[in-house]
């Protein structure tokens, strides 16, 4: 069985993944807080987690993967100084928190489907596991890690000897950049203590509350992932995945409370793809004007062109997004589809069987290549090597199909280009391309976008290439 390596945040080095049970892998993913649409920066992380899971499957592993849905309790600060994200969404749209949660959960998985991100077999809303949260908190009380103060229940981080081991930083390092106007929660024994259960909070209008041994209230954010993972994936987790901004405090706190409860190491490998940035910095919903899959579609981009864009870069590198770089990726993706369509046509014409030995050799190389720290860009390079090789069309096609079980670019759905529009229609569209180029030069982005939409309505997409803008039949 192939060995797959990833950068392990816990050890700060690339390591081969050795599951607790040979041939079987457990993986937990921090799911979305469903108060708004996921932006494409969020989705980059889920794309890379999806690739990792599918690579293990191609390599012969049985993968059991779980994900939470945060539909309660996600405050932007454990000091109760931030915003309750679900309450924020409910106020913004004049709906209940559960209406918001249902809508944006469906929207999240709709975006995932467009990007060929496989839905985990285990998906658990936080609100469905309140008894499990309470049970875990009770266990922390029994073991001396929890205390009640001011009505709330807190985790005592001073009881954890290696609390900062995931971050590799000290308490002082992690306090750098904290705003001066953030008031400490006076109920805490230690600055890094965090809430396990709220009964008193500044959010008096919080509509989601439950009975508990400590009073009527709701769970803190961190408890949910520990309780859900322990329930569905057991006490020995192989890989925990999430965005890099979850390392501290969320994942640090998950480790503290999980290991305090079970009394041994909980998770061996921590997988944190880096941020997608735009020119102004990290993408964030709090900035407003978020860039979603739907926005990309409105501008004429295929969602899988964005997936291809992400696969071109290593997951441990911050990726800078611009429409220019996405245009280049979209152009390369369309050319790739065209080449695969030609191979499909040639294979159908020849009617021969693939050379399974050659296919297996290339699949082994693909697993070894991508499995060296999830190097998807080298995986794409190997794909192009197959396209240019002397293999028969049938062998190429069978190899591409196996590669695409991981890349998930719908390569096997590639079809020959449709017939072109009449000359007079193309002439009008070419004129629009000239006008769009002038608008872009003048930085008149509104006009450029309007022209792109007009071209799309005519059944074409604009693909920007080094030689200039080209028309592509949708």
For the regions a language model picked out, list residue spans one by one.
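Alpha-helical recognition segments enriched in aromatics with Gly/Pro capping
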Residues: 1-35, 50, 109-110, 130-344
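N-terminal, positively charged nucleic-acid-binding surface of large information/translation enzymes
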Residues: 11, 20-116, 464-471
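Short, well-structured beta-strand/strand-turn elements
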Residues: 62-64, 144-150, 390, 461-463
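Short, glycine/charge-rich beta-strand/loop segments that flank catalytic centers
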Residues: 66-73, 101-108, 118-133, 151-160
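The substrate-binding groove and active-site-proximal loops of carbohydrate-active enzymes
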Residues: 88-96, 121-127, 215
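Structural preference for alpha-helix termini/caps and helix-kink/transition segments
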Residues: 282-284, 289-474
């Amino acid at each position: 069985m192939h060995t797959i390596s990833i950068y392990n945040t816990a050890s700060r080095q690339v390591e081969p993944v050795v599951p607790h049970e040979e041939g079987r892998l457990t993986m937990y993913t921090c799911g979305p807080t469903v108060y708004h649409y996921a932006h494409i920066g969020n989705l980059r992380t889920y794309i890379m987690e999806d690739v990792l899971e599918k690579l293990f499957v191609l390599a012969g592993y049985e993968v059991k993967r779980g994900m939470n849905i945060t539909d309660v309790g996600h405050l932007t600060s454990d000091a109760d100084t931030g915003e309750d994200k679900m309450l924020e969404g409910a106020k913004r749209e004049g709906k209940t928190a559960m209406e918001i949660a249902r809508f944006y959960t469906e929207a999240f998985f709709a975006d995932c489907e467009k990007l060929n991100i496989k839905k985990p077999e285990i998906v658990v809303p936080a609100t469905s596991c309140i008894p499990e949260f309470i049970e875990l908190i009770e266990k922390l009380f029994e073991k001396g890690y929890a205390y009640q103060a001011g009505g709330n229940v807190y985790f005592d981080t001073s009881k954890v000897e290696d609390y900062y081991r995931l971050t590799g930083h000290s308490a002082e390092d992690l306090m750098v950049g904290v705003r001066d106007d953030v008031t400490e929660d006076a109920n805490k024994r230690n600055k890094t203590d965090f809430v396990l259960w709220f009964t008193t909070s500044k959010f008096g209008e919080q509509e989601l509350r439950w009975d508990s041994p400590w009073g009527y209230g709701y769970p803190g954010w961190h408890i949910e992932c520990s309780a859900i993972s322990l329930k569905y994936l057991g006490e020995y987790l192989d890989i925990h995945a999430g965005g890099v901004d979850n390392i501290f405090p969320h994942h640090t706190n998950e480790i503290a409370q999980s290991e305090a409860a079970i009394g041994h190491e909980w998770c061996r490998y921590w997988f944190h793809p880096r941020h997608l940035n735009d020119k102004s910095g990290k993408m964030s919903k709090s900035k407003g004007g978020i860039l979603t899959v739907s926005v990309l579609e409105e501008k004429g981009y295929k969602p899988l062109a964005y997936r291809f864009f992400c696969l071109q870069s290593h997951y441990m590198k911050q990726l800078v997004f611009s429409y220019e770089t996405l245009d280049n990726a979209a152009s390369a993706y369309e050319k790739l589809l065209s080449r695969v369509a030609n191979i499909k046509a040639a294979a159908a014409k020849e009617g021969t069987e693939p050379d399974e030995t050659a296919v297996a050799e290339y699949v082994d190389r693909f697993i070894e290549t991508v499995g060296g720290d999830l190097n998807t860009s080298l995986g794409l390079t190997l794909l192009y090597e197959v396209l240019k090789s002397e293999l028969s069309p049938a062998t190429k096609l069978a190899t591409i199909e196996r590669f695409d079980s991981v890349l998930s670019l719908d390569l096997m759905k590639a079809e020959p280009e449709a017939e072109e529009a009449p000359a007079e229609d193309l002439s009008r569209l070419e004129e629009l391309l000239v006008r769009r180029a002038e608008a872009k030069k003048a930085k008149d982005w509104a006009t450029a976008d309007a022209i792109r939409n007009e071209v799309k309505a005519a059944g074409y997409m604009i693909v920007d290439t080094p030689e200039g803008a080209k028309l592509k039949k949708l």
